[in-house]
From Swiss-Prot:
It is found in: Cellular thylakoid membrane. Produces ATP from ADP in the presence of a proton gradient across the membrane. CDD domains: F1-ATPase_delta. It comes from the Bacteria. One of its GO terms (molecular function) is ATP binding. It is a peripheral membrane protein. Belongs to the ATPase epsilon chain family. F-type ATPases have 2 components, CF(1) - the catalytic core - and CF(0) - the membrane proton channel. CF(1) has five subunits: alpha(3), beta(3), gamma(1), delta(1), epsilon(1). CF(0) has three main subunits: a, b and c. GO terms for cellular component: plasma membrane-derived thylakoid membrane; proton-transporting ATP synthase complex. It holds the Pfam family ATP-synt_DE_N. It comes from Prochlorococcus marinus (strain MIT 9211). Keywords: ATP synthesis, CF(1), Hydrogen ion transport, Ion transport, Membrane, Thylakoid, Transport. This is ATP synthase epsilon chain.
């Protein structure tokens, strides 16, 4: 048995294929999907989607969205996504370090718009780094 996985971003079709297993970064934690999974809809957090195809694991950095599981089909609609193989690991590491620095400089500004944006950039940078390390 297998799953059909589609990962769609506004600007591109990131992944469309057959998978043996999918691990989604939902807003309530990691969610494993196998063939025969119950139908559901869940919110997707910024993080790394893992997909097993032909016994091999691949990673996709996701930037928030929604996922639907229905009849062995998993459709993931996200704000943005990148295959780990398309991410330059050293660039991702530099962006992560820069995002950490910028976020740290905003300490004490708990509810400022600037700090919220910096936190979002930090989460995106972290997801890109994690995707390259788990590829």
């Amino acid at each position: 048995m297998s799953l059909t996985l589609r990962v769609l971003a506004p600007d591109k079709n990131v992944f469309d294929g057959i998978a043996e297993e999918v691990i989604l970064p939902s807003t309530t934690g990691l969610l494993g999907i196998l063939p025969g999974h119950i139908s559901m809809v869940t919110a997707i957090d910024t993080g790394v989607l893992r997909v097993r195809t032909n016994g091999n694991w691949d990673s996709i950095a996701l930037m928030g969205g929604f996922a639907e599981v229905e009849s062995d089909e998993v459709t993931v609609l996200v704000n943005a996504a990148e295959l780990a193989s398309e991410i330059n690991a050293s660039d991702a590491e530099s962006e992560f370090e820069q995002a950490k620095t910028e976020f740290g400089q905003l300490e004490g500004q708990e509810n400022s718009t600037q700090k919220i944006k910096a936190k979002e950039m930090l989460n995106r940078a972290r997801a890109r780094v994690q995707a390259t390390k788990s590829a």
